[in-house]
Amino acid sequence: MQEKAVVLDDQMXRRALTRISHEIVERNKGVDNCVLVGIKTRGIFIAQRLAERIGQIEGKEIEVGELDITLYRDDLTLQSKNKEPLVKGSDIPVDITKKKVILVDDVLYTGRTVRAAMDALMDLGRPSQIQLAVLVDRGHRELPIRADYVGKNIPTSSEERIEVDLQETDQQDRVSIYDK
């Protein structure tokens, strides 16, 4: 894979997450009935960063959960020997029933990950509302899904790939476009 361009550096990403945090607070008139749920793996770290910023804005904490969608995907990642899905587990510290759940992921592409996440959430409770926050929306939807909060829209071709690097997993913050 050949890197074509860095489309978000660390400063641009910080600004995008700060803007998303303000939008979440504004749209929900605070965060009293809200829960951030990050989709494993990078969505969790983005959700934690949003929670930190929302805490600074509102002066109160917002609950953060982790969602593993492995069993809900239609393109399961399988272990090579016994052909069973790799499951890491979800951890949502609060009952999501009647809560506004803000799903958080790094990249929105076909919509299949988000559909799987909604299926997983519904098995855990009955939220009053599900919203979606993503760092990058690259288009190419296969399902009728759109993000409520977007850090940056990055139109891509189907021959390109978006790579999100985060400090927590990759020792740097940036978003790049690569040729496949």
Swiss-Prot record:
A Pfam family per the record: Pribosyltran
GO molecular function terms listed in the Swiss-Prot or TrEMBL record: RNA binding; uracil phosphoribosyltransferase activity
Ranges spanned by the short sequence motif PRPP-binding, renumbered to the chain: 101-113
Gene3D superfamilies: 3.40.50.2020
Keywords annotated in UniProt: Glycosyltransferase, RNA-binding, Transcription, Transcription regulation, Transcription termination, Transferase
EC number of the protein: 2.4.2.9
InterPro entries on file: PRibTrfase_dom (IPR000836), PRTase-like (IPR029057), PyrR (IPR023050), PyrR_bifunctional (IPR050137)
Protein name as annotated: Bifunctional protein PyrR
Organism, as annotated: Bacillus cereus (strain ATCC 10987 / NRS 248)
